[in-house]
A protein has these predicted regions:
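Activation-segment/catalytic-loop signature of the eukaryotic protein kinase fold
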Residues: 102
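Conserved activation segment of eukaryotic-like protein kinases, specifically the C-terminal portion
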Residues: 191-205
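Activation segment signature within eukaryotic-like protein kinase domains
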Residues: 140-141
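AlphaC helix of the eukaryotic protein kinase fold
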Residues: 57-90
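Protein kinase catalytic-loop region centered on the HRD/HxD motif
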Residues: 144-156
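Conserved short submotifs of the Hanks-type protein kinase catalytic core
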Residues: 106-120, 124
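Conserved end of the kinase activation segment
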Residues: 205-216
């Protein structure tokens, strides 16, 4: 029988107490579905489905490793994925994706999450390239730091912070989604797998020196996401920077357009030496919440000039 990698579960499929509506996302590590529970509430379900290791036989829902060697790696990754779901289920914070259930089925594992409506920061960046206000950046990232602080309090790391994993709800509040810790663990321990971090947003220690991972690793990714919010594209990848650092500092690129404080903070977060970065999310959050340092927008500056002229003329 023919096989296809990453064959999605069919629409309408009954998965435990959930009914699959449709596939809504996925990558090399997993698939994500919109589903409904028995109360007809929408949920998102992430299925552990690493395309490098497994195939789903056409017409079947079961997941099978593509070789005996891959089966051992797949089983180890499944354990990492399941443990990540268990850990995330302990976190109930408005700025962190809520994991409500996790279970085994179809010879793999699933993570059930609250379904959020809105768009990613990446979509916002693409729609407003070069025109994103500092007030928006500070508000979104300061709130996200609340969520990241909670994650770090639980002795967890995100390890895949980037604009496409920062979701902005319809009410404007942000939420951290799609944790990368299980992917990172698997790719570090199984060298035959392609790296599962995101170039440009991954810290240098994610490429090497895994023993040096810490809160500062996520802080590098926050800095890269801040940089991308201004530039519209990610900074130079950290492994390339280690060989030949061509990254133009934020303080050079956007001086005069954004506050010096914000630009200096971005550059500090993107230090290759992890000891030179902010060491805690709290210290970074304090800076982001300091709106007194914010540079007035061009619109507000023009408005103040017009008001001044009006007073002089009339």
């Amino acid at each position: 029988m023919a096989t296809q990698p990453n064959q999605a579960l069919p629409n309408g499929y009954r998965l435990n107490e959930y009914t699959i509506v449709r596939k809504i996302g996925g990558g090399g590590f997993s698939m994500v579905y919109l589903a409904r529970d028995d109360n007809n509430q929408s949920v998102a379900i992430k299925e552990y489905l690493p395309g490098q290791l497994v195939l789903r036989t056409e017409g079947s829902v079961l997941v099978q490793a593509s070789s005996t060697e891959n089966n051992n790696i797949f089983r180890h990754g499944m354990k990492c994925f399941f443990e990540e779901g268990r850990a995330l289920a302990c976190i109930d914070h408005p700025n962190v994706i809520r994991v409500t259930n996790f279970f085994r089925a179809n010879d793999t594992v699933y993570m059930v999450m609250r379904f959020e409506r809105g768009k990613t920061l990446q979509q916002h960046i693409q729609a407003n390239r070069g025109t994103i206000r500092e007030s928006f950046i500070r508000r979104v990232f300061a709130q996200l730091m609340n969520g990241l602080r909670e994650v770090h309090t639980h002795k967890l790391l995100h390890l895949d912070i980037k604009p496409s994993n920062l979701y902005i709800r319809l009410d404007g509040s942000p939420v951290l989604i799609d944790f990368g810790a299980a992917r990172q663990t698997l790719s570090q321990e199984e060298t035959k797998l392609q790296p599962m971090y995101t170039p440009g947003f991954a810290a240098p220690e994610q490429y090497h020196n895994r023993e040096r991972l810490g809160p500062w690793t996520d802080i590098y990714s926050v800095g890269a996401s801040l940089y991308a919010s201004l530039a519209g594209y990610p900074p130079q990848a950290a492994d390339a920077r280690l060989l030949n650092d061509n990254l133009v500092p934020a303080t050079v690129n956007w001086r005069g357009a954004y506050s010096d404080q914000l630009l200096e903070t971005i550059d500090q977060c993107l230090k290759l030496n992890y000891m030179e970065r902010p060491q805690s999310v709290f210290s970074l959050q304090k800076v982001l919440m300091d709106n007194t340092a914010m540079k007035p927008s061009r619109t507000s500056l023009l408005t103040s000039i017009k008001r001044s002229l009006s007073r002089e003329l009339f």
